[in-house]
Amino acid sequence: MSQLSTHPASLPATAGRPVRSVRATTSSPEFLLVGIDDLLNNRAITGAADLGDGRLNAWGNSFPAEELPAPGMLVEVAGIPFQWANAHTEGDNVRCEGQIIDIPPARYDWIYLLAASERRSEDTLWAYYDDGYADPLRVGVSDFLDGTPVFGELPGFRTTRMHYPHHVQHGLPTTMWLSRVGMPRHGRALALRLPRSVALHVFAVTLLTGIDVRRADGTTA
């Protein structure tokens, strides 16, 4: 655990960030789907008409939009619900540059990411807490092109082709990964800081609060 140089109270307030709570039954975990539309800064999904806008890597490759969810959709991957970002001309994902994601203050067990990486990336994601401390959490995302889960992730979406700036390469699959990061501290988290790694791209974020934590907080019967 590392002492914050700046107290979490100076972080952005949670007011205004769209979040959505999903719980199937009182005995199941609660998921918090975090909106990241305001942080979108990179194009990594293109259609046949805008191939040249892709910026997933240095060569301008991108995922085919036809094989991924439409903007704004609620999707489920391996039982985890996600809010797919509302893409615009400037971005459909967050290229990680140390952005802060403010979240409703609460106790969380896991961070789930739909993410992709140029080659494989392993870096630090920070969780900020209301006691003035932050925890460094390791996150690893495997290569979107290789398709091998180096860090134990699950494939979130696999496509049958990859887009280049001037053509579509059929038969060259790509992978967007479902990554999981544990939050072991029993404290109330206020915000997350994404890694400083421009090779890492985040498309959706969901947080999980365990049933044992919710009972301790008096939020379940």
Task: Report the location of each language-model feature.
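N-terminal/edge-of-domain interface segments
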Residues: 1-221
